[in-house]
C-alpha cells in the first residue's frame, strides 16, 4: 500500500495561484486544492514509502517559491 500525506501549505501574499500551478507539476502530488482557514492550500502526496514522501516534501515542495510554511499530516 502506498504512503499518503496531506501537506497544509501557507503561501506568501499574492503567490497562491503560482504555488498551486507549480505543485501540480511535482511527481507524487496527486491533488492540490485552495482552501479557507489558516492554510491556503492542501496538497495530497502519495509515494511507495514514507521516506519517498519525506524526500518529495523536503526537496521539491519546500523549494517552491512563494511557500512560507508547511505542515505535513501522514495518513494512517
Describe the role of every protein-language-model region:
Residues 1-76:
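A compositional/biophysical signature of low hydrophobicity enriched in polar/charged and small residues
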Amino acid at each position: 500500500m502506498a504512503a499518503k500525506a496531506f501537506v497544509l501549505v501557507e503561501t506568501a501574499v499574492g503567490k497562491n495561484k503560482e504555488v498551486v500551478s507549480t505543485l501540480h507539476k511535482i511527481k507524487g502530488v496527486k491533488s492540490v486544492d485552495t482552501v479557507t482557514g489558516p492554510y491556503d492550500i492542501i496538497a495530497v502526496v502519495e509515494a511507495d514509502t514514507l521516506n519517498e514522501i519525506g524526500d518529495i516534501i523536503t526537496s521539491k515542495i519546500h523549494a517552491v517559491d512563494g511557500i512560507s510554511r508547511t505542515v505535513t499530516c501522514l495518513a494512517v
